[in-house]
């Protein structure tokens, strides 16, 4: 799940005067982080009792927290539409989260639409806009629009230079487009921002192997495994190391003289 928890947990605090609905919203979000199944039931009932956009926002969050992204997308989108009708500036964040869930659900076209609506609002902070641009880049690349994805990532890096994910995804995309000098620059920045992220070490190895630097690739993939041995990145790194070993020529031995 991409960036869902930190952003949605900010939503309850966005209004200056807490109402009963705001209190219930905060309680619902908290429950969703601990027991998403119960929060799904609670938020669904709340929505049926005229809970409005806040009930739907929590319902969508709970569904996404429970990895039911395909169900979360329309509910978060509905929350955004209803919030716009109420003049609630959190609509932009609801659109952002609908887009985030759509990416996880494998619906990049819906994600681009939702994220574009989110970014059309002026209510997002720069770091939030950067996150939305990163998500939009993911969706655009999934749709085969690499140039548009590059532009979105460039905007994200400008909005939030401290956003390590923006630099990491920029590195990955540059490598795939065979822009290896750019990829190296991006991954070095990402590594400085996210020194303990196995995804960064894995990508650093991928860039090194693409550049023909087997030794650096090996070291980076070994580091990936050392950082997070039980991660999916470690599984990939292990496979990459095995492939590298298989492709390497066997050491030759000098014949012994008699």
Roles of regions detected by a PLM:
Residues 103, 121-193:
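Alpha-helical adaptor scaffolds
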Residues 21, 53-54, 87, 92, ...:
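Helix-start (N-cap) detector for alpha-helical repeat units in TPR-like alpha-solenoids
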Residues 48-49, 82-86, 121, 125, ...:
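Structural marker of alpha-solenoid helical repeat scaffolds
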Residues 33, 65-66, 104, 138, ...:
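Register position in tetratricopeptide repeats
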Residues 58, 97, 131, 135, ...:
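Canonical tetratricopeptide repeat
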Residues 6-74, 250-258:
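N-terminal leader/linker segments that initiate helical-solenoid repeat arrays
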Residues 27-29, 61, 100, 138, ...:
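Residue-level recognition of tetratricopeptide repeat
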């Amino acid at each position: 799940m991409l960036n869902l928890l930190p952003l949605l947990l900010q939503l309850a605090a966005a209004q200056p005067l807490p109402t009963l609905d705001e209190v219930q919203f905060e309680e619902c979000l908290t429950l969703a982080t601990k027991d998403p199944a119960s929060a799904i039931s609670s938020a669904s009932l709340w929505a049926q009792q005229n809970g409005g956009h806040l009930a739907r926002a929590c319902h969508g969050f709970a569904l996404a927290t429970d990895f039911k992204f395909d169900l979360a997308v329309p509910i978060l989108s509905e929350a955004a539409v209803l919030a716009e009708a109420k003049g609630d500036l959190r609509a932009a964040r609801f659109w952002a989260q609908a887009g985030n869930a759509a990416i996880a659900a494998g619906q990049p076209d819906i994600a681009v639409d939702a994220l574009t609506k989110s970014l059309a609002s002026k209510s997002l902070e720069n770091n939030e806009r950067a996150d939305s641009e990163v998500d939009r880049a993911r969706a655009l690349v999934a749709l085969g629009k690499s140039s548009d994805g590059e532009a979105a990532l460039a905007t994200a890096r400008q909005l939030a230079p401290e956003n390590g994910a923006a630099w990491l995804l920029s590195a990955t995309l540059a490598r795939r487009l065979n822009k290896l000098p750019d990829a190296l620059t991006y991954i070095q920045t990402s590594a400085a921002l996210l020194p303990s992220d196995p995804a960064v070490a894995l990508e650093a190895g991928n860039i090194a192997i693409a550049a023909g630097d087997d030794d650096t690739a090996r070291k980076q993939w070994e580091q990936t495994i050392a950082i997070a041995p039980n991660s999916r990145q470690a599984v990939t790194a292990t496979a990459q190391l095995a492939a590298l070993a298989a492709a390497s020529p066997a050491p030759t031995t000098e014949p012994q003289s008699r």
